[in-house]
Amino acid sequence: MKIKPLKDRVVVKFSSEELEKTPGGIYVPDVAKEKPQKGTVVEIGSEVKEVKVGDTVLFDKYAGSKIKVDDVEYLIIKEEEILGIVEK
């Protein structure tokens, strides 16, 4: 299934983060972590001007609406909620 965002919306795929390990050797499960704040743009709406598909972007941990499609988590956010683009 493909998600096509409308107007100024952007679909972001969460970055895959490795399982975090504490200094004491305890692995922290995903449910105990905060929402990721970095992801890759996979689709953009017709009014999006600043980002393009493939960009890695930063966003606030409470931005947008989280959805799950085919066991993959995505975030649909407004372009204005994107804090910055990570340049390589």
Swiss-Prot record:
Predominant location: cytoplasm
GO BP annotations, alphabetical order: chaperone cofactor-dependent protein refolding
Gene Ontology terms for molecular function: ATP binding; metal ion binding; protein folding chaperone; protein-folding chaperone binding; unfolded protein binding
Record flagged with keyword Chaperone: yes
Localisation per UniProt entry: Cytoplasm
Pfam families: Cpn10
Entry's Gene Ontology cellular component terms: cytoplasm
Keyword annotations: Chaperone, Cytoplasm
Chain segments annotated as coiled-coil in the UniProt record: none
UniProt xrefs under InterPro entries: Chaperonin_GroES, Chaperonin_GroES_sf, GroES-like_sf
Record family assignment: Belongs to the GroES chaperonin family.
Subunit and interaction comment: Heptamer of 7 subunits arranged in a ring. Interacts with the chaperonin GroEL.
Role noted for this protein: Together with the chaperonin GroEL, plays an essential role in assisting protein folding. The GroEL-GroES system forms a nano-cage that allows encapsulation of the non-native substrate proteins and provides a physical environment optimized to promote and accelerate protein folding. GroES binds to the apical surface of the GroEL ring, thereby capping the opening of the GroEL channel.
Protein name as annotated: Co-chaperonin GroES
